[in-house]
A protein has these predicted regions:
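Short, flexible hinge/linker loops that cap or flank conserved catalytic cores
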Residues: 1-2, 94
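N-terminal glycine-rich phosphate-binding loop and ensuing alpha1 helix
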Residues: 2-79, 141-145
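Residue-level detector of functional hotspots within protein domains
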Residues: 4, 15-21, 39, 86-88, ...
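Conserved beta-loop-beta/alpha segment of the NTase-like Rossmann-fold superfamily
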Residues: 74-77, 87-153
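Flexible coil/linker segments and helix-coil junctions enriched in charged and small residues
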Residues: 82-84
């Protein structure tokens, strides 16, 4: 059985369950303790052995892309101020971003519509689909468990 190496994270929804917070901030970017929900999800996917990630976004979700991108001015400021721990955190997040591709869903029409935007990315390869606001924390990542079950059966 072929190993699962691709993940599709769906992050194009309106975030109506967390209004009014999601009116100005994408729900995936709302913090859980000290980092955005979507970062927990990307970390889980990477820790599960997934090497290629596609995040399906919609209009007004640029913050997600920005979060996983480099920010040289911030990095320089952190180094100049001797804040090496924060510098490492910022660089680690940008490193995760190297595995991420983004696609913009033009019309929000449900899960199936969002997954269709991943067609070219996944091709005929096995992949996992994860909602951009479903955070499951555990010693053994949920995504890894699902991949093992797929590979076994």
């Amino acid at each position: 059985m072929e190993k699962v190496k691709k993940a599709v994270i769906l992050a194009a929804g309106f975030g109506t369950r967390v209004l009014p917070a999601s009116k100005a901030i994408p729900k995936e970017m709302l913090n859980i303790v000290d980092k955005p929900a979507i970062q927990y999800i990307v970390e889980e996917v990477i820790n599960s052995g997934i090497t290629e990630i596609l995040i399906v976004l919609s209009r007004g979700k640029q913050e997600v892309e920005d979060h996983f991108d480099r920010k040289p001015d911030l990095e320089a400021q952190l180094l100049a101020g001797g804040k090496t721990e924060f510098y490492k955190v910022v660089c680690d997040i940008a490193e995760m971003g190297k595995n991420i591709t983004y696609v913009r869903q033009q019309m929000q029409n449900g899960t199936g519509g969002a997954v269709m935007y991943a067609r070219q990315f996944v091709g005929n390869d096995p992949f996992v689909v994860i909602y951009g606001d479903d955070v499951i924390i555990g010693d053994d990542p949920c995504t890894a468990q699902c991949c093992r079950a797929y590979e076994k059966y």
